[in-house]
Amino acid sequence: MEFLEAIKLPFTGLRAAILATVLTVAAAAAVPAAAEDNPLGLIDPATISVGTMGDAKPYAFTTSDGNFTGFDIELFLNVAERIGFKKDQVIFTGQEFAALMPSVANSRFDVAAAAIGTTEKRKETVDFSDGYIAGYLSVLTADASITDAAGLKGKRLGVVQGTLQEIYAEKNFTGADLVKFPDNNSAVAALNNATVNAHFLDYEAAKDYSSRYPELKIAINIPSFGAPAGFVVRKGNDALREALNKALHAAMQDGTWKTLHEKWFPGTPMPEAYLPKP
């Protein structure tokens, strides 16, 4: 009996050693396989999850049937198709603006797309694709006394939390009383109810609201060409960022970007940097 046990032990040890070796080899082989199966570092390699907004017209907003549309949405769908993803493989989810970049950083979304301006501060926590649009920051108001920055002194000025407008206003409109909102719709509702005197937002969005509410006028326009909007990706996900850049520049070069800009921003000048090159 003791002899038999002595015989079994070496074979048991040998089997264990072989099993351990097989598992080690399998684990090592699994790493490159996983990378090959998910070259863009996506949360789910079969889809691209995109955080966006439902009220940032004409960039990103929801239609009456609950679908997302807008310049950013259509541009991203075109870019995604160029890197191999069909429309039904791109999953859009609406959020408040302030939550978009943290959600990408924390791997809730692969990308955020909502006319998000590129700044050095934001690049500390997330990465950006190359820029795809730039324009103006605007003050929307029904108050005829507001015609310049000085006219905002002592006024209640709405801003959407986390936006370039909030950053700019805190630095440059120090005499105004800033009131922070989760989105433009709630801020404009407050403006229409005279809870705030003015709202600071993107020019194209301001133009849309002023067309819907004729009493609201665009009183101030401030250039923001130094912070063009880009698609937000997780910090260090260079594979996805570079793929987006390649597809984005292809969309610019073949005129897709121009067509979408003309559709969503009729009459607005187009920066030459985004137009086809000879």
Name each model feature, range by range.
Residues 16-28:
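Bacterial N-terminal signal peptides
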Residues 36-114:
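Extracytoplasmic small-molecule ligand-binding "clamshell" domains
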Residues 37-38, 167-181, 217-220, 248-278:
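Ligand-binding clefts/hinges and TM-proximal coupling segments of bilobed small-molecule sensing domains
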Residues 50, 54-57, 66-83, 117, ...:
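Bilobed "Venus flytrap"/periplasmic-binding protein-like clamshell domains
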Residues 54, 133-140, 203, 207-248, ...:
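Periplasmic-binding protein-like
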Residues 73-83, 155-156, 161-164, 230-268:
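Extended ligand-binding regions for polar small-molecule ligands
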Residues 77, 90-151, 217, 222-223:
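Acidic, polar ligand-binding/catalytic clefts
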Residues 99, 114-124, 168-171, 192-225:
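A ligand-binding cleft/hinge motif common to bilobed small-molecule-binding domains
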